[in-house]
Amino acid sequence: KVFGRCELAAAMKRHGLDNYRGYSLGNWVCAAKFESNFNSQATNRNTDGSTDYGVLQINSRWWCNDGRTPGSRNLCNIPCSALLSSDITATVNCAKKIVSDGNGMNAWVAWRNRCKGTDVHAWIRGCRL
């Protein structure tokens, strides 16, 4: 599913991401834009053999199990396929674990490069939340 900007913002808010660990909703929407273009079915293979999955491009080396990543830790205890659903519950629950891991949202390269230090509120402007 390719989410609309405000549609994804509303779903993320409903799942408790707004100000989770101090990151406003705009940060999460911005990250999703530049990680997946709001596409829940996005997958991208990495040079180390791992794959990133879903709207927040969660990585199979650490966070989920896709059955083909050597040495996968599966710290979210989920199949990576769960991260491709139009229901973002699994994605949000895993993202909460990732953002609590010590590096905050710096875990997302796209957030670090394209959202951090910018006016992220713009990503939820005009949304009825």
Curated annotation (Swiss-Prot):
| Residue stretches making up the C-type lysozyme domain | 1-129
The record's InterPro entries line, in alphabetical order, gives: Glyco_hydro_22, Glyco_hydro_22_CS, Glyco_hydro_22_lys, Lysozyme-like_dom_sf
Instruction: Give the SUPFAM superfamilies listed for this entry.
Output: Lysozyme-like
Keyword Glycosyltransferase in the entry? The reply is no
Question: Active-site positions, per UniProt?
Answer: E35, D52
A single BP term in Gene Ontology: defense response to Gram-negative bacterium
Instruction: Identify which top EC class this enzyme belongs to.
Output: hydrolase
Q: Where in the cell is it found?
A: Secreted
Sequence similarity: Belongs to the glycosyl hydrolase 22 family.
Q: What is this protein called?
A: Lysozyme C
Organism annotation: Callipepla californica (California quail)
